[in-house]
Regions:
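Hydrophobic alpha-helical packing segments in soluble, helical-rich domains
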Residues: 185-207
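Conserved NTP/Mg2+-binding pocket subregion across the NTase superfamily
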Residues: 2-11, 88-171
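Metal-dependent nucleotidyltransferase catalytic core
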Residues: 2-26, 46, 52-115
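Short gly/ser-rich loop at a beta-strand->alpha-helix junction or flexible surface loop bordering the NTP-binding
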Residues: 31-45, 49-52
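Residue-level detector of conserved catalytic or cofactor/ligand-binding positions
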Residues: 214-223
Length: 223
């Protein structure tokens, strides 16, 4: 895994170093801190404003950070700990003008199981991510070739998740149509189509294309 962030501007490098400090201050159990997503791929967007489906939107890429621990924490505990890290990171910053940090967390055992089972989200992180901190006490697993039963189980899991998500968007679109909110209806229809499409892609390939931009503001629909 890569370790250098020298391709990023100095301010971004300072932000990431501060994020590492903030996590380690509140989480002694931390084993690895990994930058993934658009900042790891150097495809990030600092700020972009556009109009999509009649809605004015502003986009800013997040710092996507995977925190790996030796312990499997209960969800509310690790969320509380990482909230402290987030608050400490924003001290002295204009929170609304700063790049947002988004944490996800996994225990080293769960992360290695996910990599071993070829879960694309985690294998992509291993392939494209940047190791910001490593205690040196653990190693990441290697993905392996799955047998037919494992492939079938994973395909069914992905299909059910994405297809139901698409159904939710479609239901929202129908509500919007009934309320004559046609612009937001078109947005929900687009999301439904995208998830129906991805449910097919995931079922047959066990992989989904990357798309990660954070919506930081939605104003009223434009005329």
């Amino acid at each position: 895994m890569k370790t250098s962030i020298n391709y990023l501007p100095e301010q971004k490098r300072d932000d990431l170093r501060r994020i590492v400090e903030c996590v380690l201050e509140v989480l002694p159990d931390c084993e690895m801190i990994i930058l993934y997503g658009s900042y790891a791929r150097n495809t990030y967007v600092d700020y972009d404003q556009r109009i999509e489906y009649g809605i004015r939107t502003c986009f800013m890429s997040d710092y996507d950070i995977l925190v790996v621990t030796s312990t499997r924490f209960q969800r509310y505990i690790i969320n509380h700990i990482l909230s402290k890290a987030t608050d400490n990171y924003y001290k002295g910053k204009n929170r609304y003008a700063s790049t947002t940090v988004q944490f996800i967390d996994e225990s080293i055992d769960d992360l290695n199981k996910a990599i071993d089972k070829n879960r694309y989200f985690y294998t992509d992180i291993k392939r494209e991510g940047i190791m910001l901190y490593n205690s040196g006490r653990y190693k990441l697993a290697r993905r392996r070739k799955l047998n037919y039963r494992e492939i079938k189980e994973l395909a069914e899991e992905y299909y059910n998740d994405r297809f139901e998500r698409a159904n939710d968007f479609l239901r929202n679109a129908m509500y919007d149509k009934n309320d004559e909110r046609y612009k937001i209806c078109s947005f929900h229809l687009h999301q439904a189509c995208e998830n129906y499409y991805n449910s097919i892609i995931l079922t047959f390939t066990l992989y989904s294309p990357k798309e990660h931009l954070s919506l930081i503001h939605i104003s009223e629909p434009t005329d």
